[in-house]
């Protein structure tokens, strides 16, 4: 099978995407597929460079990659691709929309408000949420332009920074607890990972630098494990996920809260999904093969 590994892109996460793409290529080649590296520098590259491939493995992140646009283009071209479809991808990229659906479905998530201008910040609403808060681009990823703000004085500057990366900014209550991630493969939860950043929170450096954080497989207490698994499965169902997705949570006082869903989890050597799969004996090559297999089974 001729597999095009699509990477690069036009988002702030381009370098992360290129790193993911290189790793994916290296291990897909072990499976004896014909691999075509497809580096995207501008949107129209997808139409041109994807011609002739049998399957697109998406190693993209951020806008025009994780937001449903590339998925829509590939469906128009009748090229099967890895991961979730356009609707789920678009919703999960929009943190505000994701949290509204989670709240409607009675899935725990931290309180938040969204703003689209530094001149129209509702400080009273933020007071109700309670400090400290995370200020971040609504549709960003990899914790780019994400800041932990401890009082009213720091809000405007953090909002202005985040608005450089997105037209909307999320201001979310900082729920202090243990950060965990649940990797879902074909609707089943792989072993849970605890994320212990060496910095104050799991920022860009902690995510991608060697030694930026400790990510370890953990055994949750039985009742908590059940709650976490039920919540991850509820997210999968309510947001109509397919193939694979990563559900990030915080556990506070024995109660899990969903932070966000990642529909194209990173595939670098430091990435969480391969670590979780490896804990049940699934090698990186086997994981990639499963993603291809399950993706081909999805009716688009």
Swiss-Prot record:
The keyword Signal does not apply. Keywords: ATP-binding, Cell shape, Cell wall biogenesis/degradation, Cytoplasm, Ligase, Magnesium, Manganese, Metal-binding, Nucleotide-binding, Peptidoglycan synthesis. It comes from the Bacteria. SUPFAM superfamilies: Glutathione synthetase ATP-binding domain-like, PreATP-grasp domain. The keyword RNA-binding does not apply. GO terms for cellular component: cytoplasm. Coiled coil: none annotated. GO terms for molecular function: ATP binding; D-alanine-D-alanine ligase activity; metal ion binding. SMART domains: GARS_A (SM01209). Belongs to the D-alanine--D-alanine ligase family. This is D-alanine--D-alanine ligase.
């Amino acid at each position: 099978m001729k597999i095009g590994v699509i990477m690069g892109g036009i988002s702030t996460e381009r370098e992360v995407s290129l790193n993911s793409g290189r790793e994916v290529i290296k291990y897909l080649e072990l499976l004896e597929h014909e691999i075509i590296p497809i580096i995207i520098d501008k949107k129209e590259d997808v139409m041109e460079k994807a011609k002739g491939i049998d399957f697109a493995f998406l190693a993209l992140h951020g806008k025009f990659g994780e937001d449903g646009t590339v998925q829509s283009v590939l469906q128009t071209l009748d090229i099967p691709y890895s991961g979730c479809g356009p609707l789920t991808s678009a919703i999960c990229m929009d943190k505000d929309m994701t949290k509204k659906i989670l709240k409607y479905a009675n899935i725990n998530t931290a309180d938040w408000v969204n703003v689209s201008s530094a001149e129209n910040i509702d400080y009273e609403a933020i007071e109700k949420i309670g400090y400290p808060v995370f200020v971040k681009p609504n549709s960003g990823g990899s914790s780019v332009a994400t800041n932990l703000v401890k009082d009213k004085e720091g809000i405007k500057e953090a909002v202005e920074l985040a608005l450089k990366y997105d037209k909307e900014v999320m201001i979310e209550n900082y729920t202090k607890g243990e950060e965990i991630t649940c990797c879902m493969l074909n609707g089943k939860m792989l072993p849970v990972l605890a994320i212990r950043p060496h910095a104050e929170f799991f920022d860009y450096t902690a995510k991608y630098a060697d030694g930026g954080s400790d990510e370890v497989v953990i055994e949750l207490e039985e009742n908590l494990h059940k709650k976490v698994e039920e919540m991850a499965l509820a997210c999968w169902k309510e947001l109509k996920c397919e193939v694979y997705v990563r559900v990030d949570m915080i556990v506070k006082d024995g109660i899990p809260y969903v932070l966000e869903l990642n529909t194209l989890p990173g595939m670098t050597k430091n990435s969480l999904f391969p670590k979780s799969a490896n804990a049940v004996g699934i090698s990186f090559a086997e994981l990639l093969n499963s993603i291809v297999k399950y993706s081909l089974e999805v009716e688009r």
